[in-house]
């Protein structure tokens, strides 16, 4: 059908991609500081909660850090007791050891309680932030202009609500506590190591740059492969999505082998990049283990020499070795959380970018009331293009009297559907004006203006729910009797009664449990129930069989009496009784009149009409 594509959402391209792999190179924000600033403004209302999280995380970490040194006293007491027992000068002081173990148990128990509290508070804050963002995005969608959705894919819009908000929430929930815990652990452990032995601390710290250098080398090498993996994961998802969505076309043209070959090529690249990235990423743990063991060996050797000289105790060596492990662990955690923060900020940037998009002006000062609209419509020298380089409607002028049935016909791309979009203010004209009852459409509030129009599109839209609920969508406060009356007027009552449950029959997600013709009848019943003074029928009967079309046509004829109606028709035989037929070509009206008048002119309309019957024969 002609420019009906303007009403359709662009084809899906798999932009949602899929979940980000572990260790994958993070997407970086274009404006890191600006995005962080906006995110902080959302978190700002939870200052007390954030402060409590930081305090609890720090306290829990401090108790954990103190534990090993106190446990070292147990090791020292055991070794000294063993030496006394061997020398025959005494035995184990289990009373002393028991007291220390109780103290350590209490410390770790308090640490767990504080960790639980900070986790509980942070999860609550994160979910509240995500809830608020999702709510704002949902409200924003209803205020966005049509051009935004027609220039983007399904996945690109949906990912703002799903993937991006989830990534933001996950990063927010983990990054703050991880950073606080890691920094507190590093500082606390460093202080405790210095209190045991500055020399051993120096040895442990010297090994640290080796660890950082090796990890940085591996990360740098693997990031390129992770980037390729991420890119081709998106390609894989896109191919699967498109193949599934168009599986009937693929099968009808016997293109299964071509699709499989194309998929295999993409999958081979994904396999190669994923193998290399995961292999290199998997090398990090062995490298850290090697460096860590090297550090343990150096510390143990130095500690043994110092213990022989009675500079430190055996318990101090045991505690110090544990501290060395605790000292390197936060470095890995911070490296991981930095990637997570980058992904979080990039996701928040996309969310805020969406929230900052230009909105439609929903209201005007001193708006014209839509009550009592008669339905007179004037197009005065309207010019419009979706972009500056291409003008679709060049100089469109017409006067439509109240109650007239106006058919708009023309070849593909003539601008028929665009006229309807301008009438409902999905777009605003570049030049000229559109008047309803003598008032410029820009003088109405958009919402109230659109309430004056009833619309039936070629692409039927029904949501998951009962048939009763779907018809009632046209008038939410309608009674069951009004819904049934609308269904009868649309000649839909009979087939509804034959369905399991009748009006309570549950439609599935894409309403595939009813036929295309039945879907069309339900959307017409919805428009009848809405009872708007002006009707727009965009190929309302093009998707149904001839018998169903006849039933619909009779119902629509009754509905259109006394109402201004615009019919965009491809089958010209359906608009013979229109009061006025506007014939469009290249954005202009080239002919207008009744069906008989236009045929008598033997012009462009006659050519269109005759060509359809030639094709049919």
Where are these regions (language model features)?
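Helix-loop-helix
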Residues: 81, 192-206, 276-349, 354-355
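Alpha-helical segments in transporter systems
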Residues: 17-19, 37-40, 48-73, 104, ...
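An intracellular "coupling" helix at the cytosolic face of ABC transporter transmembrane type-1 domains
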Residues: 146-147, 163-172, 176, 221-242, ...
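Transmembrane helices of ABC transporter permease
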Residues: 45, 49-62, 73, 107, ...
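Transmembrane helix-loop-helix hairpins at lipid-water interfaces of multipass membrane proteins
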Residues: 50-114, 195-199, 310-314
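Short intracellular "coupling" helices and adjacent cytoplasmic loop segments at the cytosolic face
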Residues: 22-27, 127, 135-159, 163-165, ...
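Juxtamembrane loop-to-helix connectors within ABC transporter transmembrane domains
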Residues: 35, 43, 122, 142-186, ...
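ABC-type nucleotide-binding domain
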Residues: 2-5, 363-364, 370-617
């Amino acid at each position: 059908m002609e420019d009906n594509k303007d009403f359709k959402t662009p084809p899906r391209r798999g932009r949602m991609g899929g979940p980000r792999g572990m260790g994958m190179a993070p997407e970086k924000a274009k404006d890191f500081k600006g995005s962080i600033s906006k995110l902080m403004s959302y978190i700002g209302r939870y200052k007390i909660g954030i402060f409590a999280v930081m305090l609890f995380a720090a306290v829990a970490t401090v108790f954990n850090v103190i534990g090993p040194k106190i446990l070292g006293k147990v090791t020292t007491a055991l070794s000294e007791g063993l030496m006394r027992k061997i020398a025959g000068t005494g035995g184990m002081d289990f009373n002393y050891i028991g007291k220390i173990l109780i103290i350590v148990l209490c410390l770790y128990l308090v640490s767990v309680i504080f960790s639980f509290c900070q986790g509980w508070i942070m999860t609550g804050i994160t979910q509240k932030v995500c809830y608020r963002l999702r709510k704002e995005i949902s409200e924003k969608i209803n205020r966005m202009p049509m051009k935004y959705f027609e220039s983007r894919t399904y996945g690109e819009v949906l990912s703002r609500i799903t993937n991006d908000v989830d990534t933001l929430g996950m990063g927010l929930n983990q990054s703050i506590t991880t950073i606080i815990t890691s920094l507190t652990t590093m500082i606390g452990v460093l202080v405790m190591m210095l209190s045991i032995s500055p020399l051993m601390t120096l040895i442990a710290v010297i090994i640290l740059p080796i660890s950082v250098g090796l990890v940085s080398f591996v990360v740098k090498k693997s990031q390129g492969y992770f980037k390729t993996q991420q890119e081709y994961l998106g390609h894989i998802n896109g191919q699967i999505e498109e193949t599934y969505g168009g599986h009937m076309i693929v099968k009808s043209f016997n293109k299964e082998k071509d699709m499989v070959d194309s998929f295999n090529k993409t999958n081979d690249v994904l396999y190669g990049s994923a193998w290399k990235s995961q292999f290199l990423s998997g090398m990090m743990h062995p490298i850290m283990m090697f460096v860590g063991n090297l550090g343990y060996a150096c510390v143990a050797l130095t500690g043994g020499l110092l213990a022989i000289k009675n500079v430190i105790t055996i318990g101090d060596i045991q505690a110090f070795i544990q501290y060395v492990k605790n000292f390197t662990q936060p470095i890995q955690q911070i490296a991981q959380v930095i990637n997570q923060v980058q992904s979080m900020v990039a996701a928040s940037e996309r969310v805020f970018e969406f929230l900052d998009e230009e909105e439609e002006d929903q209201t005007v000062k001193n708006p014209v009331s839509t009550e009592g609209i008669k339905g007179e419509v004037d197009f005065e020298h309207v010019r419009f293009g979706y972009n500056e380089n291409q003008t679709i409607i060049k100089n469109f002028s017409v006067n439509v009297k109240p109650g007239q049935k106006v058919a708009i016909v023309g070849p593909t791309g003539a601008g028929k559907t665009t006229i309807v979009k301008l009438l409902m203010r999905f777009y605003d004209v570049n030049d000229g004006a559109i008047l309803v009852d003598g008032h410029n459409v820009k003088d109405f509030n958009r919402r109230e203006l659109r309430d004056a129009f009833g619309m039936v599109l070629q692409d039927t839209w029904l949501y998951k729910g009962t048939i009763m609920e779907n018809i009632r969508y046209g008038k939410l406060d309608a009674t069951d009797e009004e819904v049934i009356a609308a269904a009868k007027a649309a000649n839909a009552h009979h087939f509804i009664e034959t369905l399991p449950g009748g009006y309570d029959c549950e439609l599935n997600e894409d309403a595939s449990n009813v036929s295309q013709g039945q879907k069309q009848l339900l959307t017409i019943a919805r428009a009848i129930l809405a009872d708007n003074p002006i009707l727009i029928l965009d190929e309302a009967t093009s998707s149904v069989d001839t018998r169903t079309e006849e039933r619909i046509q009779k119902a629509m004829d009754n509905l259109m009496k006394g109402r201004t109606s615009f019919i965009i028709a491809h089958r010209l035989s359906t608009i013979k009784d229109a009061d006025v037929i506007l014939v469009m070509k290249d954005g202009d009206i080239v002919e207008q009149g009744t069906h008989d008048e236009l045929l008598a002119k033997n012009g462009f309309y006659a050519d269109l009409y005759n060509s359809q019957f030639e094709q049919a024969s």
